Amino acid sequence: MLFADVVGFTKVTEDLTPVFVEKFLGGISEMIKKLSRAPAFVNTWGDSFFAVFDDLDDALNLSMQLRDYFSGDTWSELGLDDGLEVRISMHAGPVYEEFDPVLGRRNFFGHHVNQAARIEPIVLPGSVFVSEIMAALLSFGHDDFDFEYVGNLELAKNYGSHPIYILQRTGYKDSI
């Protein structure tokens, strides 16, 4: 699972909201089209994005593409001199796929969805944080990606303390 949230979204003025939506959701849509398989589920709300994947490689690739998309000059037309940054979290685990009568479509629920969502608010802007489960999955056959232990961090909304790692492409160095 992948959660993403835009840091600094509240600085976008109301009249530029349509530009933001076009760039943010339009950009994600284009990235999804380039994946080998579309996510099993996606949802958006405002400046947030949630996706459930059947394929770990696609989830990893989308997380890096999304991170890099925000590091470019895509956001200058929004009048933000310092741009926007994204926080991305990833976690894996069994979830419930159920019909959501409010949305009128299937949705995903459960402890692991909640844990993925609770990691996202603590992510350093411009970074991808992953759970220990994701780091373990990356250890087997995913040589294009590296992870580094960040610490045993307190998750948002009193969700407890969990081992967290930063995800990056192999050979990419970023200061934590």
Map each language-model feature to its residues.
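A generic structural signal for short hydrophobic patches within well-formed alpha-helices
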Residues: 9, 59, 95, 134-135
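Residues that scaffold the ATP/ADP-binding catalytic core of kinase and kinase-like folds
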Residues: 12, 52, 98-99, 137-138, ...
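Catalytic core of nucleotidyl cyclases, primarily class III adenylyl/guanylyl cyclases
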Residues: 33-58, 73-111
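Solvent-exposed polar/charged
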Residues: 34, 121-122, 140
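Active-site phosphate/pyrophosphate- and oxyanion-stabilizing loops and adjacent acidic/basic residues
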Residues: 117
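Intrinsically disordered, glycine/charged-rich C-terminal tails and inter-domain linkers
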Residues: 125-176
